[in-house]
Amino acid sequence: MTVLIHVLGSDIPHHNRTVLRFFNDALAATSEHAREFMVVGKDDGLSDSCPALSVQFFPGKKSLAEAVIAKAKANRQQRFFFHGQFNPTLWLALLSGGIKPSQFFWHIWGADLYELSSGLRYKLFYPLRRLAQKRVGCVFATRGDLSFFVKTHPKVRGELLYFPTRMDPSLNTMANDRQREGKMTILVGNSGDRSNEHVAALRAVHQQFGDTVKVVVPMGYPPNNEAYIEEVRQAGLELFSEENLQVLSEKLEFDAYLALLRQCDLGYFIFARQQGIGTLCLLIQAGIPCVLNRENPFWQDMTEQHLPVLFTTDDLNEDIVREAQRQLASVDKNTIAFFSPNYLQGWQRALAIAAGEVA
């Protein structure tokens, strides 16, 4: 049987590193279909840190896409597992027959599915991508993204799968000893990416709570983002006093980020799509409820796991937040499907489906 090849078709270092390390540590030892990767980006020590994997790096999306298409045409039994996909050439290859549906298996990361960019180039490309998505052999996604996808692609097979968030399961039972009274601390957004709509989110928080809460905005990733960070900081200072606004411009190491999250009382995310599942997982693990846009279908996954969900359209106050905290504290976090190690079973099944080992 031909070994499955995994494709990370866009240079998104943080996510790509997470996926590679997860495969190296959790999957490669038990499945030959979890070892071969083609990745856009620089090695930056990844090969050394993932010795169980065979990783081929490419300088750009186009060079990777050309290599994938060549392999697909040379051997029609070759199957590919595409993790996220910001790569137009690959979509066009699927649409034109360069890659066959039986060769194309796709793990939706959220942003790949939604059509939120307003640029002309994107608006012209979206209809073509939509047509190509009808030809995918099987999609893997969160419950919410599957329900979104099936509305326009009802004939494509869909399977539940969660991004492998880096988590320490031993923290599931750790009580959050933060004092749950007095001034609340609210985390706004999951990164410095503009998709977080930071300014609109800060205005929404201010409209709900005024200048009575402390707001923390993590913007250390992606790099080279100083102008936008300053724009967000200035907008925040028009709404909140300096002592109540903390805009973080430096990238935090994992343990430092975890410590930051555990100082919060609430996460506030206004983006109208599924994203930031890693931050959501870490907040929930720490007993911190989250406010979501009702257009973000991940609320379906949360309610399926009996987790409290607050919405940006709700009338929020401290009593409501504290009640959500109490509800979250009563949940057995070891049973949550999108937590580690529970998502591992979904990945093992996804590998078997993509490799053709199970129907």
From Swiss-Prot:
It is found in: Cell inner membrane. Pathway: Bacterial outer membrane biogenesis; enterobacterial common antigen biosynthesis. The keyword Glycoprotein does not apply. GO terms for biological process: enterobacterial common antigen biosynthetic process; fucosylation. Its EC number is 2.4.1.325. It comes from the Bacteria. It is a peripheral membrane protein. Catalyzes the synthesis of Und-PP-GlcNAc-ManNAcA-Fuc4NAc (Lipid III), the third lipid-linked intermediate involved in ECA synthesis. Belongs to the glycosyltransferase 56 family. This is TDP-N-acetylfucosamine:lipid II N-acetylfucosaminyltransferase. It comes from Escherichia coli O9:H4 (strain HS). The lineage of its organism: Bacteria, Pseudomonadati, Pseudomonadota, Gammaproteobacteria, Enterobacterales.
